[in-house]
């Protein structure tokens, strides 16, 4: 069991609450991340405030950074102890994005990173820069590029 911040459907500051979340061990192609930081950007503000409120209950926050604490059996790219940051469009690693709206964006179309632990496929992560804090790394994928 871990904790998460939730946003009720439609958004709005009065619809944010702290709750519990069950988490299993990562699947064969996933890693488990202990999140240490998240950065706030306009997209998060718009979702939480209700400007772009979600159609169903959602864990907000599009960006996160933390440490790999468990690794699925098929994962070769990452290891326990690696510092990582999430990506705004999971699975988009290079080339032109194959994205339709915000359906795959954490904190909007899928649950985001306002939580303690998360299991993710490696295509949703990148190694954080050496010598950067989790707080600095959390700003890279959205806030750092806008």
Spans of model-derived segments:
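Residues that act as N-cap/strand-start positions at coil-to-secondary-structure junctions
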Residues: 15-18, 112
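Short N-terminal binding/cap micro-motifs at the start of the first secondary-structure element
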Residues: 11-16, 42-44
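Glycine-rich beta-strand-centered segment in the early N-terminal region that forms part
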Residues: 23-38, 48-93, 109-112, 129-131
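NAD(P)H dinucleotide-binding glycine-rich loop of Rossmann-like/cofactor-binding domains
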Residues: 89-146
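Short, acidic/hydrophobic/Gly-rich beta-strand patch recurrent on exposed beta strands
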Residues: 6, 19, 46-49
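Conserved hydrophobic/aromatic beta-strand scaffold that supports enzyme active sites
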Residues: 18, 23, 65-67, 117-119, ...
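Alpha-helix/helix-capping structural signal
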Residues: 38-40, 73, 123, 145
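Short structural boundary motif marking the start of a folded domain
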Residues: 1-5
């Amino acid at each position: 069991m871990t904790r998460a911040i939730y946003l009720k459907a439609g958004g709005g500051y009065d619809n944010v609450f702290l709750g519990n979340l069950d988490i299993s061990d990562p699947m064969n192609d996933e890693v488990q991340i202990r999140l240490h930081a998240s950065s706030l950007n306009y997209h998060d503000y718009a979702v939480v405030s209700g400007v772009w409120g979600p159609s169903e209950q959602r864990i907000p926050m599009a960006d996160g950074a933390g440490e790999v604490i468990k690794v699925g059996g098929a994962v070769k790219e990452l290891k326990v102890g690696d510092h990582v940051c999430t990506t705004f469009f999971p699975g988009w690693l290079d080339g032109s994005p194959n994205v339709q709206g915000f359906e795959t964006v954490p904190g909007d179309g899928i649950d985001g990173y306002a939580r303690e632990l998360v299991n993710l496929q490696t295509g949703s992560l990148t190694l954080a820069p050496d010598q950067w804090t989790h707080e600095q790394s959390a700003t890279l994928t959205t806030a750092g590029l806008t």
